Structures are given as C-alpha cells and as structure tokens.
Amino acid sequence: MDKIALKITFSAETPKYAQSVLTEYVNFVSQYSLNQTNQEFKQGFNLRLDELRFSKEQIEENLTEEKKVQVENLTNALDIAKKAGIKDFSRGNNISDSKLADGTYLFILAEKYLQAQLDIAKNTPVVYPANYYITDRQLFKLNKLASQLELVEDVKTYYYLSSPDYPVVKDNPKRSLILAIGFIIGILLPTFFILLGSVIQTNKKQS
C-alpha cells in the first residue's frame, strides 16, 4: 500500500468468477465511498444552514430588542414630560446629545416631540440591514437544494483506465514453469555428459 493506492490481489478458480468478484468488490467500494462522501457533504451542508439561520435570528432578535428598548425609553420619557407639564421643547435647555442618548433626559424634548417619536417607533416596521437579506436569500436557495440531497443515485465514484476483462484461454503458470525447467535441464544435461565423456577420455590417454 502506498500513499495514494491500495493494491489487492486474489485468485479464483475461473476467469469469469474472478471478474465477477472484482465487479462486486468495486461496486461495494464505490457505494461505500459514495455514502461516506454524501454523509460528509450533508453534515457540512446542514452546518452551513444552521450558521445562516443563527445569523438571521441574531439580526432579528437584536433589532427587535433595540426597538423594544427605544419604545420603552420614549414611553417613560413621555410619562415624565406629561407629569412635569413640559409640552413644547425649549432650546434654552442646554442638554448634551450624550445625556439624551442614554434615555435619562429624554423628557426634556417635551410631550409633543416625544409623542410623535413614540408613534413612529411603534408603527414603523423594523429596517433590516443588507446582510440580513443576503443571508435570507442564501437560506432560501439552500433549502430548495436540501431536498435534492437524497436523490443521488447511480453515481460512480471511480472510472476504469481500461475495462476489466478475462482471457479466453485460462492461464496455467505451473505448466509454463515446468516447460521452462525442462528447457533448462534439456540444455544442461547434454553439456554435462559431453564434459564427463571428455574427462574420461583424457584419463584413459594418460593411463
């Protein structure tokens, strides 16, 4: 086994059976890989949906809470202005913007102004930022695609460099080995006898 491939070998009684086993194994691995890939993709897909939903809900909750606080501050300021008899705003009241911003001195703005602001705050719909609508569109599109995740069928996670096939004539490695050994012996034996005969003749002459 190397970094990018796994080599598997097996033997079978017939070439046809070997091809059948190979096909079944490849289909099994293909389906397993497809299931794993699909599962991982779904997890990432659903995680993205959750992130978008959370982002959208956070924007809605924050703006709703801001509007609620604004209405409460204006209502309280209006009640104080009514009790204090402050009908109209006087520019002589030198109140800084920072004091008005925290709601403590809003009553200085007087009853008429506060009532108008309160009516606007209650009746005006929440204005959402651009990223809210971008998030909403993404959610809409992804939700339409979600139903199609279950429609993945007949997908192959592999392709053949060449189609698998089996030989017409069955391979016989034992027969080939025997023939090779016989060929080698056929060459060596005559050579051995020739050398042996030569040695015997030489010994006779010397005697």
From Swiss-Prot:
It comes from the Bacteria. Its main location: membrane. InterPro entries: Bact_polysacc_biosynth/exp (IPR050445). It is found in: Membrane. Keywords: Membrane, Transmembrane, Transmembrane helix. It is a single-pass membrane protein. GO terms for cellular component: membrane. The chain crosses the membrane at residues 177-197. The keyword Cell inner membrane does not apply. PANTHER family: FERRIC ENTEROBACTIN TRANSPORT PROTEIN FEPE, TYROSINE-PROTEIN KINASE. This is Uncharacterized protein HI_0866. The lineage of its organism: Bacteria, Pseudomonadati, Pseudomonadota, Gammaproteobacteria, Pasteurellales.
